[in-house]
């Protein structure tokens, strides 16, 4: 991998329904093989299911779920003096959002419900209630960071 240039950060347009960039990013993480319209249908029908099940505004539930999933620390492997150390580092805001959306979609895909929109809706509801696979992933990441706190002075 070339280290010459850093990839430019492209701006993401807000989605047409909620007018929020985060929802577009969710659509983009759900999207497979460039089929964006299918991904949008999945996300919007998942939001309809959330409204139906909780009776609350779906974007608020989604935002609450993201806040619960967002990691504050992560582990980075660093090689020092011939041995590898798991160094806990703080996560940047941009990466926090990326990781939380990625975990949300990955654990939604692993669920056993019949359709993807139902899986996504239930994973978002679970995450807003501080349960589910994505929350477990965040807790495991924080536990690993806490366990390797002794190596925090290797941070770069």
Swiss-Prot record:
Top-level taxon in the UniProt lineage: Bacteria
A molecular-function term among this protein's GO annotations: tRNA binding
Tagged with keyword Ribonucleoprotein: yes
Keyword presence, RNA-binding: yes
GO biological process, one term: translation
Cellular component, GO annotation: small ribosomal subunit
Family matches, as Pfam families: Ribosomal_S7 (PF00177)
Keywords from the named record: Ribonucleoprotein, Ribosomal protein, RNA-binding, rRNA-binding, tRNA-binding
Family the entry assigns: Belongs to the universal ribosomal protein uS7 family.
Role played: One of the primary rRNA binding proteins, it binds directly to 16S rRNA where it nucleates assembly of the head domain of the 30S subunit. Is located at the subunit interface close to the decoding center, probably blocks exit of the E-site tRNA.
Subunit details: Part of the 30S ribosomal subunit. Contacts proteins S9 and S11.
Full protein name: Small ribosomal subunit protein uS7
Source species of the chain: Mycoplasmopsis pulmonis (strain UAB CTIP) (Mycoplasma pulmonis)
């Amino acid at each position: 991998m070339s280290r010459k240039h850093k990839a430019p950060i492209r701006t993401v347009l807000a989605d047409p329904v909620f007018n929020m960039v985060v929802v577009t990013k969710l659509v983009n993480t759900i999207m497979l093989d460039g089929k964006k319209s299918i991904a949008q249908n999945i996300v919007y029908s998942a939001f309809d299911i959330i409204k139906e099940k909780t009776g609350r505004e779906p974007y608020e539930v989604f935002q609450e779920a993201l806040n619960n999933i967002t990691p504050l620390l992560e582990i980075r492997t660093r090689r020092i003096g011939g041995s590898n150390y798991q160094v806990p580092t703080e996560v940047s805001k941009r990466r926090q959002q990326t990781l939380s959306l990625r975990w949300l979609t990955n654990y939604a895909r692993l669920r056993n419900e019949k359709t993807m929109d139902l899986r996504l809706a239930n994973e978002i509801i679970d995450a807003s209630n501080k349960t589910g696979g994505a929350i477990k992933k965040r807790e495991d990441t924080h536990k690993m960071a806490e366990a390797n706190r002794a190596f925090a002075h290797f941070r770069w």
